[in-house]
A protein has these predicted regions:
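An acidic intrinsically disordered interaction segment
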Residues: 2-14, 80, 144-158
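N-terminal signal-anchor module of multipass membrane proteins
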Residues: 1-57, 290
Length: 295
């Protein structure tokens, strides 16, 4: 009796070496805005906190407004994050355990713990100033919130760079860039608030500081670009790469630096801050797009 022949599948020559076997996440504009709002909120808090602790006579008024604005951006950021997860309960489920070895768990807890002192710091700005104990409460809240704000700023970069997604897995400087960018965005936000509130001494100090931040931010950005240069070459044609470089380097660094250093017109200083934010958005969009270029 003739036996049926068994079909044996032959593995691909060379196996899976050099092959992409992951599926790109179904992320788009929402997660890009989530990353931007996270950077603005944490950066505003970090810059305002340091300014308020170092020179309250100069920055206290603008810092109070910055804490309230940072809380608003955090609420929008968390809403974007929850909608991006698809199920609002998923964020809640991540709070049931603490895994110090998991960037997702650490980041979720940092966001939660950051929101508490931020809320206190923002609330003290709207309560009656006659309450003398409020200043002490605000300072304690600021100090307590600093490490959690820093953790919230850095965790998304660490989370993406430890994934298996093409482009992200090579982005070892992503956490460093997002943290540096958050502080730069915070400086731009503080400068804008100081301008709108007529805080001349704060504006003078923040213009100088923001010029330094914009320049220093180019270092982690350059290291990040070096990490993901292969993925960028797959994601963009040459004209697209030049366009992205023009937006990020020209619009996000050179133009703002020029406006900050040689210009005294209030409107143009606001333009400098806006350019920094738009460049940050463009870079985050390019980061989110990297795995899709290899799928």
């Amino acid at each position: 009796m003739r036996t049926a022949a068994h079909t044996v599948s032959t593995p691909l020559q060379g196996g899976y070496v050099g092959r992409t076997i992951t599926h790109a996440p179904a992320w788009g504009g929402l997660v890009t805005w989530d990353m931007l709002f996270n950077g603005i909120s944490t950066g505003l808090f970090l810059v305002a906190a340091i300014c308020d602790l170092a020179a309250p006579s100069i920055f206290a008024r603008a810092a109070g407004a910055a804490f309230a604005l940072a809380l608003l951006f955090l609420v929008v950021d968390l809403a974007s994050l929850v909608f991006d997860l698809g199920d609002p309960l998923r964020f809640h489920h991540m709070l049931r355990v603490v895994k110090l070895g998991s960037p997702m768990s650490v980041g979720t807890w940092c966001l939660t713990l950051y929101s508490l002192p931020l809320t206190v710091a923002a609330a003290t700005g709207v309560l009656p100033s006659e309450w003398m104990s409020l200043e002490a409460v605000r300072r304690v809240a600021i100090v307590v919130g600093l490490p959690f704000a820093l953790g919230s700023a850095v965790y998304k970069g660490v989370l993406l760079s430890t994934s298996a997604q093409p482009g992200w897995k090579d982005a070892r400087w992503l956490g460093g860039y997002l943290t540096s960018s958050a502080i730069t965005l915070g400086g731009a936000g503080m400068l804008t608030l100081s301008l709108l509130m007529g805080e001349g001494r704060a504006v003078a100090a923040l213009r100088f500081a923001l010029g330094i931040l914009v320049t220093v931010n180019l270092i982690p950005l350059g290291l990040l670009v070096a990490d993901v240069r292969v993925a960028l070459a797959r994601a963009y044609r040459l004209p697209g790469l030049f366009g992205l470089a023009a937006v990020c380097l020209g619009g996000g660094a050179l133009l703002p630096f020029y406006l900050l250093v040689v210009n005294d017109i209030t409107g143009l200083l606001v333009v400098a801050a806006l350019c920094i934010a738009l460049a940050g958005l463009a870079i985050r969009f390019a980061i989110v797009r990297l795995p899709h270029a290899s799928s």
